[in-house]
Amino acid sequence: MKYFQFVALVLIVLTSCQKPVLNPEEFQTQFEKSDGVETATYAELIDFYKRLDLASENIRLTPIGQTDSGKPLHLVQFNAQGNFAASKDQYKLLINNGIHPGESDGIDASMMLFRDLASEKIKIDNPKLLISAIVVYNVGGALNRNSTTRANQNGPVSYGFRGNARNFDLNRDFIKADTENARSFAQVYHSIKPDLFIDNHVSNGADYQYVITHLFTQHNKLAGPLGAFLDQTWQPYLEQAMAGDKYPITPYVNVFGRTPDPKGFSQFMDYPRYSTGYTSLFNTLGMMVETHMLKPYKDRVLST
């Protein structure tokens, strides 16, 4: 009798420790509630991921390191078995959002991604896949909210500021690390050692028909086989996979009021001051996403 009582007690304890079943309707983002014209505030972001962490065994939100704003950097992670300890035998993706908080597309896209992973709308069973995202890298800029510093951009209604709490452009500080943000990024990056790195941005001016473009790190900067994989496998696969989609993707161009050279466009050189240039120093395959600022915010987020 005592044995059965013990087993029953253990089952009750285990059941009480399980997180409740996630209801996606309780995790609608501000982007979705506004029909694609608004982005989440910093407070809404952190609250969203805290609730998602509580609702799903497969999601974890962790404060890691400090930022110049005095608030910590937050990392959100997904693993199908709730194994968040990065290891060599895992396939690891790291996403960076909100380095320029006025370019908020990746912030909202990631909220929906992690919600859909947790609710299994996007079904991933592979226990070796670890997806991590910096919720918002430029916390100080996210808190400095306005509607005027990206006047030529087609939404959202309000957004954060490009400079951080000390007015640094964080996408020029990765190798120099003058800011607490950059030092905390290094802590996150080297603790995960990601195979793939994606940094989400919005373009600043050149006009073209594409909603979304990509900017891969230079393949010839990477070790031979790795560079060949980026150039001959990953980039072509991404372009082909999105070719039949509503949002085809093409290489990023940045020209202002001049005709391109007859030989073609020059590729953006991602020095180590930039995120993908920094991560390529450690043989991580890097890609910067650039959505087009003149396209509607809803399309930009959905394409991301």
What are these regions (language model features)?
Residues 1-26:
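Bacterial Sec-dependent N-terminal signal peptides
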